[in-house]
């Protein structure tokens, strides 16, 4: 399946809300048919975002870049050793619903947390978990943090590697 990349030691440079962030988003696990994986060994999208944009906007960019059709719950995990690290800070959707247990474990709400607030550095990685039932796990590598964004609309997908997997696999068809 898609390789989980190991990144070099983080550089000293951190970002802010004025900076431009370049992320490589890799699918590291999920309900992928073997026939699809054989044809698409690496599945990634490179996305650029401004530091004043939110994690919700990053989610929407990933959702669109991988051509997903149905929304599901998701979270970002930042500050750990990559995706699935239980020690990472979790940023979740909709903390206003009064779920005290959820609020206690979440570091923030994706709709209010801006990219520049995360404190990520170049060459760091963080996780994105989409669809808590089907468990699509992604590793997001911070490829670059530039002083300021150029003109144009952001978020912006700048590179696609591999085809977008179907959101739902027809396992009956796969067995034939």
Short names for language-model regions:
Residues 1-176:
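Short linear regulatory motifs enriched in tryptophan with gly/pro/ser
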């Amino acid at each position: 399946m898609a390789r989980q990349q190991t990144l070099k030691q983080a550089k000293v440079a951190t970002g802010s809300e004025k900076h431009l962030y370049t992320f490589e988003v890799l699918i590291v696990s999920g309900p992928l048919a073997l026939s699809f994986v054989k044809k698409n060994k690496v599945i990634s999208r490179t996305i650029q975002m401004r530091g004043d944009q939110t994690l919700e906007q990053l989610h929407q960019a990933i959702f669109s870049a991988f051509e997903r059709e149905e929304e599901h719950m998701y979270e970002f995990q930042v500050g750990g050793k990559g995706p699935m690290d239980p020690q990472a800070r979790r940023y979740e959707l909709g903390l206003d619903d009064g779920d005290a247990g959820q609020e206690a474990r979440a570091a923030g709400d994706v709709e209010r947390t801006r990219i520049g607030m995360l404190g990520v550095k170049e060459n760091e990685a963080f996780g994105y978990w989409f669809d808590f039932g089907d468990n699509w796990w992604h590793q997001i590598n911070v490829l670059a943090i530039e002083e300021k964004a150029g003109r144009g609309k952001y978020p912006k997908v700048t590179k696609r590697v591999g085809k977008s997997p179907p959101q739902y696999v027809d396992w009956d068809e796969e067995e034939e």
